[in-house]
Curated annotation (Swiss-Prot):
<comment type="similarity">
    <text>Belongs to the Nudix hydrolase family. RppH subfamily.</text>
</comment>
<protein>
    <recommendedName>
        <fullName>RNA pyrophosphohydrolase</fullName>
        <ecNumber>3.6.1.-</ecNumber>
    </recommendedName>
</protein>
<keyword id="KW-0479">Metal-binding</keyword>
<dbReference type="GO" id="GO:0046872">
    <property type="term" value="F:metal ion binding"/>
</dbReference>
<dbReference type="GO" id="GO:0034353">
    <property type="term" value="F:mRNA 5'-diphosphatase activity"/>
</dbReference>
<comment type="function">
    <text>Accelerates the degradation of transcripts by removing pyrophosphate from the 5'-end of triphosphorylated RNA, leading to a more labile monophosphorylated state that can stimulate subsequent ribonuclease cleavage.</text>
</comment>
<dbReference type="GO" id="GO:0006402">
    <property type="term" value="P:mRNA catabolic process"/>
</dbReference>
<dbReference type="GO" id="GO:0005737">
    <property type="term" value="C:cytoplasm"/>
</dbReference>
<feature type="domain" description="Nudix hydrolase">
    <location>
        <begin position="12"/>
        <end position="154"/>
    </location>
</feature>
<dbReference type="Pfam" id="PF00293">
    <property type="entry name" value="NUDIX"/>
</dbReference>
<feature type="short sequence motif" description="Nudix box">
    <location>
        <begin position="46"/>
        <end position="67"/>
    </location>
</feature>
<dbReference type="InterPro" id="IPR000086">
    <property type="entry name" value="NUDIX_hydrolase_dom"/>
</dbReference>
<dbReference type="InterPro" id="IPR020084">
    <property type="entry name" value="NUDIX_hydrolase_CS"/>
</dbReference>
<keyword id="KW-0378">Hydrolase</keyword>
<dbReference type="InterPro" id="IPR015797">
    <property type="entry name" value="NUDIX_hydrolase-like_dom_sf"/>
</dbReference>
<dbReference type="InterPro" id="IPR022927">
    <property type="entry name" value="RppH"/>
</dbReference>
Amino acid sequence: MSNSSKKHLDLPYRPGVGMMILNADNHIFVGKRIDTKISAWQMPQGGIVPGETPSIAAMREMLEEIGSDKGYIIAESKFWYSYDVPSFLIPKLWNGNFRGQKQRWFLIRFTGNNEDININTSNPEFDQWRWASLDELLSIIIPFKRKLYQAVVKEFESLIQ
C-alpha cells in the first residue's frame, strides 16, 4: 500500500444524506453529474450542515439539487452507509479532507410533476435527469457507489413495490 493510500485511509468520512426520490410510478430520480466527462448517474445526495438533522438536510438537499421540495419522507435508513471515492478523486473533492461519505438515506415520495423539477439551480450538480426503474438503477450508477446503492435498494425495496 502506498503512503498516499495509507494517508487517504486515515481521512474521515463526510457526513451526508442521500435521497431515493420516487414518482407516482415508483420510478427513481437520477441525475447525470455535471462535473465529469464520464456518464456518472446518481441519486441526489449532499452534506449535513452542523446542527442540522439528517431529515432536514435531506429535504434541503432535494430542493437544492432538483429545484423542488414537493415530497415527503416515507422512510429513513436504519444504518449509516458509507463509500470511498477513488483515491485520484480525493484531492478534487471536499478540499481533500474526506475519503468518502457516510450517509443516512431517505425514501421520499415526490408529489410534484416533471415540470416542478428544475436542475438548473444556483449551484447545479446535474446536466440531465430522468426517472429510472428499480431494475435499471444499479446498472447506470457510477461503479464506486454501486455497493452502497445495493444496500439502500435492499433496505427500501419492500416499501417501493
